[in-house]
Regions:
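Conserved beta-hairpin
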Residues: 1-27
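Alpha-helix boundary/interfacial micro-motifs
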Residues: 26-28, 48-49
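Acidic, Ser/Thr- and proline-rich intrinsically disordered linker/docking segments
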Residues: 34-99
Length: 99
């Protein structure tokens, strides 16, 4: 069963990050987020590159951005996009919709 990996609160995001060896949880207040981007990308599906979308969250806490792709988050991806767009607007976080 799939589970959510991005949770939005009024002023905070909770990100579940799945690594190679472990799963970690990152709490981010709105002032720690530099930008939220929706971008087009290519994703490998069954040995072929396919057009896809991704969410990129850049923060002050981490050197690397947090990336969530459409095919890995298939069940919740559209909900993530709606919630993050609303979160960015309400908390004055820089938001780019590059789709």
């Amino acid at each position: 069963m799939a589970s959510r990996r991005i949770y939005c609160d009024k002023t905070e995001l909770v990100l579940v990050v799945v690594g190679k060896n472990r799963v970690s949880t990152v709490n981010l207040r709105y002032d720690e987020i530099v930008s939220i981007r929706f971008q087009r990308c290519k994703e490998i599906r069954f040995f072929w590159p396919v057009s896809s979308e991704r969410i990129v969250i850049t923060t002050r806490k981490s050197d690397k951005p947090f990336i969530y792709t459409k095919y890995r988050e298939k069940k919740f991806f559209n909900e993530y996009k709606q919630e993050l767009a609303k979160f960015a607007k309400e908390n004055n976080v820089t938001f780019y919709n590059e789709l």
